[in-house]
Regions:
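Conserved ABC transporter NBD signature motif
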Residues: 69-80, 342-350, 362
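ABC ATPase NBD coupling module
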Residues: 81-98, 116, 124, 131, ...
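Conserved ABC ATPase "signature" region
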Residues: 133-152, 350, 400-417, 527
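Conserved ABC ATPase signature
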Residues: 156-161, 165, 422-426, 430
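A short, proline-enriched helix->beta-strand linker immediately N-terminal to the Walker B motif
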Residues: 176-180, 441-445
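ABC ATPase "signature
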Residues: 242-243, 251, 507-508
Length: 550
């Protein structure tokens, strides 16, 4: 085994890292990767799905799955990690290296309070601490990550916190052992832009203040520009470019890096010319109120007096932070959320005035695309079978008609060569294209797309959006596109409605709302949207920190 060169100014040193899967005929998936992380430095590893970035992070943590084998050198403060026994690796994990996961809610136990979980994390690394001392330390950690009113939050459960607050709790737990290296795996993917900015500020401050190294795994070039000092670009398991963030993002040497940057949607790129909309109203939402809860926990008004409409061939973007009510509106339209007050009119039919059977018939003409296609596809069905299912069971097609319809849809979503694959054999973008094909298979009059690209890499996102746009232009369905990514909304939508705490704050043509916002809240959302420009992102962070300090 090649031994690491110990250097006092390096937290992590990776040399000639190679990872192979399988024992009899091993397949190498990471090919000779080298990089270092200095104290207080944030190094971002970027690349598409399958690039090897997550496998590299798992190698550092010593968490490769059974059957995987790593060679080369991974040294933490000069100590070689490859070759350590499991018990020795367990002592390194948590104590010297800690992981911040992608899904902040899933990483917390829903049946225990926040305080219990942070205290347990503290005591796991220092059993000499008593319960009272561990509780004081837990409160200090919550304060460190800017959790408001930490004493009160200690008694709350994960479901009572927002996604951003749950992610901060996850960071606090990762800091419980005062690790020298933090590995942040897509830490802001599930967060809206304003919360994302706040979490990135916390990470940047913690790294620089305490001299921790941070290994950031991400596909978001705006996040890279905001927080990273250096960038490692990976493709197909190999390192294709490595350098300072300013150099890599503004003057990339590798064609692949330029390709990644070109795929990033940017606010303001699309011209301001608005397409002519049809006069036919396909969807009307009038004075909609949606409430949850009851006598025990009180009533929460998730949607408060919302009115909007969408015409044939038009895409309306719903944007806003987590908890703004945008997804609840989508669920109310498809009948999956209770309508407390107000009404929903679909293609001229008031849904509150028709029978249940008629509502079911009408809603069959509404297509839905969810954020995570893996949960909406049957793992036992091939691509062809998944697309055929709604066409046969609801559309009633059989035999040759069914085969021709499915083949046409496969071509529409560029998956004709994947017709006999199963979901686990597809990439995230390919699975989402299957979901889109299913959603449009019955020629919907309305389509609800709820964060359909938020979990995808930028180049894959661009491919999915291109498929989506082609289908919408040809089929002319009315679309409600729910997203927290303003650049994607700017690229795709015709009109935009901005939501905050269940109310519409601003609505109008896309260019008007996103170029000349009239409401302070919309202006704040736009200012928080990350862009792949390190100079601009650093200036924005300085403004944010100055505003929060005043």
């Amino acid at each position: 085994m090649k031994m690491a060169e110990s250097h006092p100014d390096v937290v992590l040193s990776v040399r000639d890292l190679r990872v192979a899967f399988g024992r009899n005929s091993p397949v190498e998936v990471v090919h000779g990767v080298d990089f270092d992380i200095a104290p207080g430095e944030v190094v971002a590893v970027v690349g598409e799905s399958g690039s090897g970035k997550s496998v590299t992070a798992l190698s550092v943590m010593g968490l490769l799955p059974e059957g995987a084998h790593a060679t080369g050198s991974i040294a933490l403060h000069g100590r070689e990690l490859l070759g350590l026994r499991p018990k020795e690796l367990q002592q390194v994990r948590g104590a010297q290296v800690a992981l911040i996961s992608q899904d902040p809610v899933a990483s917390l136990n829903p049946v225990f309070t926040i305080g219990f979980q942070v205290v347990e994390a503290v005591r796991a690394h220092d059993r000499s601490l008593g319960r009272r001392a561990a509780r004081r330390r837990a409160v200090e950690l919550l304060e460190l990550v800017d959790i408001p009113d930490p004493q009160r939050r200690m008694g709350q459960y994960p479901h009572e916190l927002s996604g951003g607050q749950c992610q901060r709790v996850g960071i606090a737990m990762a800091l419980a052992s005062d690790p020298r290296l933090l590995i942040a795996d897509e830490p802001t993917t599930a967060l809206d832009v304003t919360v994302q900015a706040e979490v990135l500020d916390v990470l940047a401050r913690l790294g620089r203040r305490d001299g921790r190294g941070i290994l950031l795994i991400t596909h978001d070039m705006g996040v890279v520009a905001d927080i990273a000092d250096r960038v490692v670009v990976m493709r197909d398991g190999a390192l294709v470019e490595d350098g300072p963030v300013q150099e890599v993002l503004t003057s990339p040497a590798a064609a692949y890096t330029r390709q990644l940057l070109d795929a990033v949607p940017r606010l303001g790129q699309r011209d301001e010319e608005e397409p002519a909309a049809s006069d036919r109203l396909m969807l009307e939402v009038r004075d909609l109120v949606v409430e949850y809860g009851g006598r025990l926990r009180g009533v929460v008004r998730a949607v408060d007096d919302v009115s909007l409409d969408v015409r044939r061939g038009e895409i309306l973007g719903l944007v806003g932070e987590s908890g703004s009510g945008k997804s609840t509106i989508g669920r109310a339209i498809i009948g999956a959320a209770p309508v407390t007050e107000g009404g929903i009119v679909i293609d001229g039919t008031d849904m509150s005035t028709v029978s249940r059977a008629e509502r079911t018939r009408i809603r069959r003409r509404i297509g839905v695309v969810f954020q995570n296609p893996a949960t909406s596809l049957n793992p036992r069905y091939t691509v062809r079978e998944s697309i055929a299912e709604p066409v046969a069971t609801i559309g009633g097609l059989r035999g040759r008609e069914l085969r021709e319809r499915v083949e046409s849809l496969l071509i529409d979503v560029d998956l004709a060569d994947r017709r006999d694959h199963y979901p686990h054999q597809l990439s995230g973008g390919q699975r989402q294209r299957v979901a889109i094909a299913r959603a449009v298979s019955l020629d919907p009059t309305i389509l609800i797309a709820d964060e359909p690209t938020s979990a995808l890499d930028v180049s894959v996102q661009a491919q999915v959006l291109d498929v989506f746009r082609r289908l919408q232009e040809r089929l002319r369905f009315a679309c409600v596109f729910i997203s927290h990514d303003l650049a994607v909304v700017d690229e795709l939508c015709d009109r935009v409605a901005v939501l905050h705490h269940g109310r519409i704050m601003e609505t109008g043509p896309r260019a008007q709302v996103l170029r000349r916002p009239q409401v302070a809240y919309t202006q704040r959302l736009i200012a928080a949207a990350p862009v792949p420009d390190p100079v601009l992102q650093r200036a924005r962070r300085a403004e944010r920190l100055a505003a929060s300090a005043s």
